[in-house]
From Swiss-Prot:
Extra remark beyond the main annotation: In eukaryotes there are cytoplasmic, mitochondrial and chloroplastic isozymes.
Pfam families named in the record: Aminotran_1_2
Cofactor dependency: pyridoxal 5'-phosphate
Matches recorded under Gene3D superfamilies: Aspartate Aminotransferase, domain 1, Type I PLP-dependent aspartate aminotransferase-like (Major domain)
Gene name of the encoded protein: Got1l1
Compartment(s) of residence: Cytoplasm
CC terms in the record's Gene Ontology section: cytoplasm
SUPFAM superfamilies documented for this protein: PLP-dependent transferases
PANTHER family, A to Z: ASPARTATE AMINOTRANSFERASE, ASPARTATE AMINOTRANSFERASE, CYTOPLASMIC 2-RELATED
Keyword Transferase set for record: yes
Listed GO MF terms: L-aspartate:2-oxoglutarate aminotransferase activity; pyridoxal phosphate binding
The EC number(s) this enzyme carries: 2.6.1.1
Protein name: Putative aspartate aminotransferase, cytoplasmic 2
Natural source organism: Mus musculus
InterPro entries cross-referenced by the UniProt entry: Aminotransferase_I/II_large (IPR004839), Asp_trans (IPR000796), PyrdxlP-dep_Trfase (IPR015424), PyrdxlP-dep_Trfase_major (IPR015421), PyrdxlP-dep_Trfase_small (IPR015422)
Amino acid sequence: MTSLSVFRDVPTAQKLEGSLLKIYRQDGYPSKLFLAYKVCMTEEGHPWVSLVVHKTRLQIAEDPSLDYEYLPLVGLKSFIQSSLELLFGKHSEAIAEKRVGGVHIVGESGAFQLGAQFLKTWRKNVKIVCIVSCQKEQCGLIFQDMGFIVYEYSIWNASDLCSDPSMFVEVLQHIPVGSILVIGNITDCKFTQNQWTKLMSIIKSKQIFPFFDIPCQGLSTGDLEEDTKILQYFVSLGLEFFCSQSLSKNFGIYDEGVGILVVAALSNQHLLCVLSQLMDYVQALWGNPPATGARIITSILCNPALFGEWKQSLKGVVENMMLIKEKVKEKLRLLGTPGSWDHITRQSGTHGYLGLTYQQVEFLVKKKHIYLPKTSRINFTCINARNIDYITQSIHEAVMLTEG
């Protein structure tokens, strides 16, 4: 006799935007393309890995002095220290004053999971979390599961085809006092110092708690310090915040899920209290973070020669990416595609907006088998010499068919 399953009332989970990749994989068209990978891609269409990572991984594997014991709850301390110095600079006053610290976490989502758990417990009167559109899928569910009400916002001006600080100001002016604001990819927002100063003034006056996300330091401008100077400015003025610092993409260690949850506090005393609470949550969530990726990164960051090699590899990725953007813009110009495409090269970072309408995106997906999100925000490293002509010709056709 068949017994009833204890899982009989469990439904299939609601489909996420991530199903775009599933649809792509089910497409039998031989020349299909996917332009929404999260990782950096090589010219050959494979995930990019810094060459210095390969070398360092082998050295660590052959080191007989290393043990494989559990790490402390806080994680690998040398990794945390070197990561903080990478983020804020070796001579940071905040580091010297010991008012910034971190917890070694499991992947970028681990930072949001840990941070959300803390905020749920210690900011019980706060229910609103505002998340930038391109990150809602990634961390929105985490906050929802914690009982927060999640609002989505965008700072991309679809009319002017640029990041618009006035849209950011409007978001800040309308969200409730004390809300949590997830600020993603600040390295890709080309705001001026004065614009950031105005934004920070509103954040402080409304007691908004910022939760920054730094997923790929160095892959925006090719300059590690330039990519985080706004974060350094914020911490220099005593702003308290959390920050998810992921080091998976800029080292090419995607399967390791390497990063830290950074805490910036007013004083060392406040910092230590927060870290102690976070470590309690760590014990319940994962107990022990992965060590191999952290050891690879620490070895590179603490060795001047290896660090120099790694920086050069980042510059190589950024230079290649900038060249791809220039080629896409030029090919669209030569095809006579209506509209200006200057916004493609004005954007920094691996990901950027093509500035297409939903109708044009739908044409690319259904008629050309080119898969990209409805927002037309793509990973430019997915474009290479083998597919650029097909992609630009398809964009041209999409625009021409929907023009007017």
